[in-house]
Amino acid sequence: MGNIFHTPVLLDEIINLLEIVYVNDGFIFVDCTLGEGGHSSAVLRKYQNISVIGIERDDIILNRAKEFLVEFKGKVSYFNAWFDDFFSEYSLSSKANFILADLGISMFHYKMSGRGFSFFEDERLDMRLNPGAGGLSAYDIVNTFDKVRLENLIYEFGGEHYSKRIVSSILEYRKIKKIKTSRELQGIISKAYPRIKLKINPATKTFQALRIYVNDELFRLKRSLPLWVGSLSRNGILAIITFHSLEDKIVKEFFKGLSKEQYCILTKKPIIASFEEKRCNNASRSAKLRAIRKLYE
């Protein structure tokens, strides 16, 4: 078994939810965001008679997951696809007993992908989770979008109140040369920011906005939600881990809109990481877990 870069968040809380519905016969666990396989490996190690369907849009990280989960050969089915595409194009042989979607970006992408996800690394701006599929990269966006389009993007998907100042600096820089790397963009943003105390890096919100836009993350989430609940078995659970308010609001409102006769919300308030987990795993600090249970089909 190989090593992984990413520590799965809220793992104990996911296991606690699984305990509610686990049955020792034909249990199907769907990991919509397999990553390196952290959540799935823990589930497979704890429960002997369980089948995992692992969905991952990045073929490179999917191969890492296959190496990490090699000891569970025969218990995991792998699919290289976006989770919304998978559920719209494939039919499960049986309804799922548990569906998990961890919407965070893997530490592998920040540390090892070389695609410019992190402003601490000096990498070519890309941010596509599946670059082989084509589509606009972050490089294309920051070098070709006009003023209004860039301002709207950074404000809408990043909640960045200094979007106009940032875009003004980007456009000035573009007059001289193209913005090629994540470190380059981070420097432009930092210089545009007012000199105020911040809890986060000035580039955080802009990088989030670019990544969300490049990968169409919010659209994919909205598209997936009805597909996920439709794929649950009777008494099945859908658990979703979000990492920013835009995602969390979408999930919260969708859950509230479901029939109270058919679905039971298991998290009246989102579950957050414990003090100890936050201390040991910085990635868990902004994580929120919401879950529902399907009472009948």
UniProtKB/Swiss-Prot annotation:
It comes from Borrelia hermsii (strain HS1 / DAH). InterPro entries: RsmH, SAM-dep_MeTrfase_MraW_recog, SAM-dependent_MTases_sf. Specifically methylates the N4 position of cytidine in position 1402 (C1402) of 16S rRNA. It catalyses: cytidine(1402) in 16S rRNA + S-adenosyl-L-methionine = N(4)-methylcytidine(1402) in 16S rRNA + S-adenosyl-L-homocysteine + H(+). Its EC number is 2.1.1.199. Its main location: cytoplasm. Belongs to the methyltransferase superfamily. RsmH family. NCBIfam families: 16S rRNA (cytosine(1402)-N(4))-methyltransferase RsmH (TIGR00006). GO terms for molecular function: rRNA (cytosine-N4-)-methyltransferase activity. It is found in: Cytoplasm. Keywords: Cytoplasm, Methyltransferase, rRNA processing, S-adenosyl-L-methionine, Transferase. GO terms for biological process: rRNA base methylation. GO terms for cellular component: cytoplasm. S-adenosyl-L-methionine binds at residues 37-39, 56, 87, 102, 109. It comes from the Bacteria. This is Ribosomal RNA small subunit methyltransferase H. PANTHER family: 12S RRNA N4-METHYLCYTIDINE METHYLTRANSFERASE (PTHR11265:SF0), S-ADENOSYL-METHYLTRANSFERASE MRAW (PTHR11265).
